[in-house]
């Protein structure tokens, strides 16, 4: 059995991750669940909090206190929290599955450095459908090449705090790499006022926030006389959680390295 710990187990995504881990029993088992220090929920059964019934795993407020109880940590928390957990797992030799978004270049470099010592799967989106979309985007960009104007439109719920989404940025990276462009130089984030004509090599991003939208992403390849749209719509966060658990299983006995969901699915 793959022993899995969930960080942020009392949060919206954390409770779904707890459920997803339990759904894969006996291949996986939730053996630790961590919440923020000082939380009033410390000691509460993680299964009961996730409406699964009692599973015998009390919420802990300290990762170090459960270090001997898990093999891999699933972490979808904020960047500053995740990086502290990364440092601990690197020192303790624990594998990680990381779904944190909003990382800057320096923070991503810390992930790469940690990957020299422990196996890590880091992805902006753990949905199988999204990762298949990334493969399709690579193909479309290479075939359409300079003939298409490319725009990425994403929509999420009102509570999401980073924009564009990590998934939208990853889509942009895949397209830019396929076209041998530097995304930092060609990305255009929103348009307003008198912008002038569209520069041909740019990749545009548009962001929508509202309601309870789980996650919609559309990439538009606009050519002369035709348009190609590649769209993915998530209707439940469980799709992300199931992908994260799949990644945790894939990491079993894996050599140290920084992997992504494309590696897990064999799409590279």
Curated annotation (Swiss-Prot):
Gene3D superfamilies: Dihydrodipicolinate Reductase, domain 2, NAD(P)-binding Rossmann-like Domain
Active-site residues, Swiss-Prot/TrEMBL: 156 (proton donor/acceptor), 160 (proton donor)
Sites where the protein binds (S)-2,3,4,5-tetrahydrodipicolinate: 157, 166-167
Positions of NAD(+) binding: 8-13, 99-101, 123-126
GO cellular component: cytosol
Alphabetical UniProt keywords: Amino-acid biosynthesis, Cytoplasm, Diaminopimelate biosynthesis, Lysine biosynthesis, NAD, NADP, Oxidoreductase
Cellular localization per UniProt: Cytoplasm
Pathway(s) where this gene product acts: Amino-acid biosynthesis; L-lysine biosynthesis via DAP pathway; (S)-tetrahydrodipicolinate from L-aspartate: step 4/4
Reaction it catalyzes: (S)-2,3,4,5-tetrahydrodipicolinate + NAD(+) + H2O = (2S,4S)-4-hydroxy-2,3,4,5-tetrahydrodipicolinate + NADH + H(+); (S)-2,3,4,5-tetrahydrodipicolinate + NADP(+) + H2O = (2S,4S)-4-hydroxy-2,3,4,5-tetrahydrodipicolinate + NADPH + H(+)
GO biological process, one term: diaminopimelate biosynthetic process
Binding, NADP(+): 36
Family designation: Belongs to the DapB family.
Biological function: Catalyzes the conversion of 4-hydroxy-tetrahydrodipicolinate (HTPA) to tetrahydrodipicolinate.
HAMAP family named among the record's database cross-references: DapB (MF_00102)
Protein's name in the database: 4-hydroxy-tetrahydrodipicolinate reductase
């Amino acid at each position: 059995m793959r022993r899995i710990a969930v960080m942020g187990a009392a949060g919206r995504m954390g409770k779904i991750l707890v459920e997803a881990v339990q759904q894969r029993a006996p291949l996986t088992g939730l053996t630790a669940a961590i919440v923020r220090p000082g939380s009033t929920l410390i000691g509460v059964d993680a299964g009961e909090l996730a409406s699964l019934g009692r599973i015998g795993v009390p919420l802990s407020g300290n990762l170090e206190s459960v270090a001997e109880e898990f093999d891999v940590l699933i972490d979808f928390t904020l960047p500053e929290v995740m990086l502290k957990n990364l440092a601990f797992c690197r020192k303790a030799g624990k594998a990680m599955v990381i779904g944190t978004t909003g990382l800057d270049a320096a923070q991503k470099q810390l992930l790469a450095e940690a990957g020299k010592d422990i196996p890590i799967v880091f992805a902006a989106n753990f949905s199988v459908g999204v990762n298949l979309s990334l493969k399709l985007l690579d193909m479309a960009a290479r075939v359409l090449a300079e003939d298409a104007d490319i725009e990425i439109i994403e929509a999420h719920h009102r509570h999401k705090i980073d924009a564009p989404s990590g998934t939208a940025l990853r889509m942009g990276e895949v397209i830019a790499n396929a076209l041998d462009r530097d995304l930092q130089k060609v990305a255009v984030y929103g348009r307003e006022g008198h912008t002038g004509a569209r520069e041909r090599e740019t990749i545009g991003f548009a962001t929508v926030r509202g309601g309870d939208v789980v996650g919609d992403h559309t990439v538009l390849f606009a050519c002369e006389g035709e348009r190609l749209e590649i769209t993915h719509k998530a209707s439940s966060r469980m799709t992300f959680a199931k992908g994260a658990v799949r990644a945790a299983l894939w990491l079993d006995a894996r050599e140290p390295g920084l992997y992504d969901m494309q590696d897990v699915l064999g799409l590279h």
